[in-house]
Amino acid sequence: MATINDNYLKLKAGYLFPEIARRVNTFIEANPEAKIIKLGIGDVTEPLPEACRTAMIKAVEDMGDRSSFKGYGPEQGYGWLREKIAAQDFQARGCDIDASEIFVSDGAKCDTGNILDIFGKNNKIAVTDPVYPVYVDTNVMAGHTGETNEKGEYEGLVYLPISADNHFVADIPSEKVDLIYLCFPNNPTGATATKEYLKAWVDYATANDSIIFFDAAYEAFITDESLPHSIYEIEGAKDCAIEFRSFSKNAGFTGTRCAFTVVPKQLTAKASDGSQVELWKLWNRRQSTKFNGVSYIVQRGAEAVYSEAGKAQIKGLVSFYLENAKIICEQLKSAGFEVYGGVNAPYIWLKTPHNLSSWDFFDKLLQTTHVVGTPGSGFGAAGEGYFRISAFNSRENVEEAMKRITQAFKV
């Protein structure tokens, strides 16, 4: 008889967002007239920028003409897109990243999980707590953890707690770890990292032969000029870090699917025989074997992000969502909530009122205001007692949601 990957049986009952959807759907079935406002999953609501739409329409026409038709493209992405990414996202900020070190993909979520394919099973892995659940669950699936303890933590992972006490940025661990997940601006807390803070991590990784997985999916929301957008703005990071980026939140590509991962060619890790192996070669081999590349049409849309019109339109989109975040923060604070994030980030992280658990507050919010957010405990044990609200929605919905919440709750 065929056997399964038993590691999947270690996973908790449901991935966070499907569980939210299940509860919301159950509520809707019982209350079909309720107008639900979803500020939970970080999905965008505003249309694709005109520059991207125009480029994609032209690309569709290209596919209808024999002379410009495109079949399989390079697994790593078309050169014209990779060159623009390298020049405008990295070289313009003083980062020595070459186009050949950029791998275009269909999502940062996919890449942060798939990157584990090129690493061994005996690495000691560190994640913050709370944390984006994909980092943990993909390690469970890959067999890098044991079972969960009474707190819901997986054996074999090193959890780095983040809270108001440390401004939601983890302390550098005293023990040696091999792989480190960092996300800034942070999902779920909205915290940001200074250059000095990232330099401390780069120094730690260099001293311990560690690799940093740096998720910069929300870097476009940084408005503070003193804050780094890329870990490669830090000296030495090319020797110890892989960076993940996405067009999902800045350009509204959540349903279009395009992202990229940066693997510097000088980055190495150790083989079982002790030799140093270039990770670029392994990732290139992995992508060439398991991935056929992002569609030509979508990549043309992503290329338009870097046009003058595209940059202006994306700036407008980002500003729109940041204004939503500002409204959410101001309204919740006026009602007495303890609020974090929402500046340089599209997520607001709040303390649940009256000592409610994260899921109890979720249910109460849904039942009384018909507003959906994300329970902090779904991001880890240290997220218990917190709640995430997303700024990704229409202005009308955000204002209505805040009106409902502030009328229903006085903290």
Swiss-Prot record:
UniProt keyword annotations, A-Z: Aminotransferase, Pyridoxal phosphate, Transferase
Protein origin, superkingdom: Bacteria
Residues carrying N6-(pyridoxal phosphate)lysine: K249
EC numbers, comma separated: 2.6.1.83
Residue positions binding substrate: Y15, G42, K109, Y132, N187, N292, R388
Reaction it catalyzes: (2S,6S)-2,6-diaminopimelate + 2-oxoglutarate = (S)-2,3,4,5-tetrahydrodipicolinate + L-glutamate + H2O + H(+)
Entries under CDD domains matching the protein: AAT_like
Keyword Transferase in annotation: yes
Record bears the keyword Membrane: no
Pfam (any one): Aminotran_1_2
Any GO BP annotation: lysine biosynthetic process via diaminopimelate, diaminopimelate-aminotransferase pathway
Required cofactor names: pyridoxal 5'-phosphate
Residue sites binding pyridoxal 5'-phosphate per the record: Y72, A108, K109, Y132, N187, Y218, S246, F247, S248, R257, N292
Pathway: Amino-acid biosynthesis; L-lysine biosynthesis via DAP pathway; LL-2,6-diaminopimelate from (S)-tetrahydrodipicolinate (aminotransferase route): step 1/1
GO terms of molecular function: L,L-diaminopimelate aminotransferase activity; pyridoxal phosphate binding
Family that this chain belongs to: Belongs to the class-I pyridoxal-phosphate-dependent aminotransferase family. LL-diaminopimelate aminotransferase subfamily.
Role noted for this protein: Involved in the synthesis of meso-diaminopimelate (m-DAP or DL-DAP), required for both lysine and peptidoglycan biosynthesis. Catalyzes the direct conversion of tetrahydrodipicolinate to LL-diaminopimelate.
Quaternary assembly: Homodimer.
Name used for this protein in its record: LL-diaminopimelate aminotransferase
